[in-house]
A protein has these predicted regions:
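Conserved core of the sugar-phosphate nucleotidyltransferase
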Residues: 105-192
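Short phosphate-binding loop-to-helix
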Residues: 47, 53-115
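N-terminal glycine-rich phosphate-binding loop and ensuing alpha1 helix
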Residues: 2-50
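Hydrophobic/aromatic residues located in beta-strands of well-ordered beta-sheets
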Residues: 6, 46-48, 95, 125, ...
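Nucleotide phosphate-binding site architecture
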Residues: 23, 56, 189
Length: 192
């Protein structure tokens, strides 16, 4: 697939788990695992967007591309937009915001999301999976998404709402939101 870029926003100063990108998983930093997942999708250029020189140097030392961004961004999508707006020579058709804490994601789902975006002319897309157990259902660190229809076998639905905590039992149309977003370039400009 051409004309797609995957941008991974990553920073050391996270509130819930400081230095998370540098945490070791099997003797390798989490951000390197995430970068490898993105590369293994084989859909386009991969760039890590970070305000931290330590992350930049780690990515570059491992033959990846990283750029320094402003350290004042409120969200990862703001960081992604800075790279899109100021650091790319040509503007890709699809921008994938792949969260820097997803080292176990199957690279094929990134490819599936990009293919769906192109085939269905979507402006914005994201992924969801089944909520596996009661603990995940109650965990405020697990973002849930409520959709307008049952999603099975790579089907797609419209997101109705996103939330972390619910005071009532979850609807059967509530799923575990996966932290990856795809935008057309026009949608990213409108969103940010």
């Amino acid at each position: 697939m051409n004309n797609i870029v995957i941008i991974i926003p990553s920073r050391l100063n996270a509130e819930r788990l400081p230095n998370k990108p540098l945490k070791l998983i099997n003797n390798k930093e989490m951000i390197l695992h995430v970068h490898d997942v993105a590369k293994d999708s084989n859909i386009g250029q991969v760039i890590v967007a970070t305000p931290d020189r330590e992350i930049l140097e780690l990515i570059e030392k491992n033959n990846g591309k990283a750029v320094i961004t402003n350290n004042k961004h409120e969200t990862g999508t703001d960081r992604v937009f800075e790279v899109f707006e100021k650091k790319l020579n040509s503007k890709p058709e699809i921008i994938i915001n792949f969260q820097g804490d997803m080292p176990n994601l199957n690279p094929n789902v990134i490819k599936d999301l990009a293919e769906h975006m192109k085939k269905n002319l979507c402006d914005v897309g994201t992924l969801a999976s089944h909520i596996e157990n009661h603990h995940e259902e109650k965990d405020p660190n697990v973002v849930k998404v409520l959709v307008d229809k049952n999603i099975e076998n790579k089907s797609f639905a419209r997101a109705v709402d996103f939330f972390r905590i619910s005071n009532k039992p979850l609807d059967k149309l509530a799923y575990h939101h996966v932290g990856i977003y795809a935008f057309t370039n026009k949608a990213l400009i409108r969103y940010v």
